[in-house]
């Protein structure tokens, strides 16, 4: 039998992983790779930002408050009685969400910087967080506390809340006041709100 003119021999390639990873972040390579990393993560972060705004406006609490002092309690937080706008005590014509909207709609500044060993530090500036939103949502009558946090942890005095859709002349909101007597045994029903929305946002941002 004739000998084959083709022969195969085993070969192997040894790659120095540490050296390879270091080369990715060294000098010009670091800048070029950093650009590619940023190009990859930017759409992910931008989508997360858009989803954050969408989730905020789609939340039942946001929708109810935006409908003002004549809304129904569609969020279910008040047991179907009255509405959050008048219970919290927002003034007629006021915009409880102006500062929140500034926070969640702010343009994020994404920076990628090479460190060592193929690693990159990703910094996201202007990103909103739960605490900053709580600070931007003070009660109209108590600046040290957040009504948005109260939605999640509970609000007192629901039993003394009187709602009258036809109007109450002494009411800040126009349709609701707190009275001295206990009118009902209703208690506030907490619900996930800003914390849940922000946790989802952060998970989407870091998933890359």
Language-model features, listed with the residues they occupy:
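Short, Lys/Arg-rich flexible segments
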Residues: 1-208
């Amino acid at each position: 039998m004739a000998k084959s003119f083709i022969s195969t021999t085993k070969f192997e390639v040894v790659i120095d992983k540490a050296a390879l990873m270091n080369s990715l972040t060294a000098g010009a390579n670091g800048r070029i790779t950093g650009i590619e990393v940023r190009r990859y993560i930017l759409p992910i972060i931008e989508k997360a930002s858009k989803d954050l705004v969408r989730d905020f406006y789609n939340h039942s609490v946001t929708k109810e408050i935006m409908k003002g002092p004549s809304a129904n309690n569609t969020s279910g937080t008040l047991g179907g009685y009255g509405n959050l706008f008048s219970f919290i005590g927002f003034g007629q014509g006021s915009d409880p969400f102006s500062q929140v909207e500034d926070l969640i709609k702010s343009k994020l500044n994404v920076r990628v910087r090479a460190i060592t060993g193929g690693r990159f530090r990703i910094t996201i500036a202007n990103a909103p967080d739960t605490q900053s939103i709580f600070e931007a949502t003070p009660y109209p009558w108590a600046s040290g506390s957040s009504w948005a946090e109260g939605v999640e942890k509970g609000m007192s005095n629901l039993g003394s809340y009187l709602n009258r859709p036809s109007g109450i002349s002494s009411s800040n909101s126009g349709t609701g006041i707190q009275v001295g007597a206990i009118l009902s045994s209703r208690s506030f029903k907490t619900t996930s709100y800003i914390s849940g929305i922000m946790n989802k946002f952060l998970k989407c941002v870091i998933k890359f």
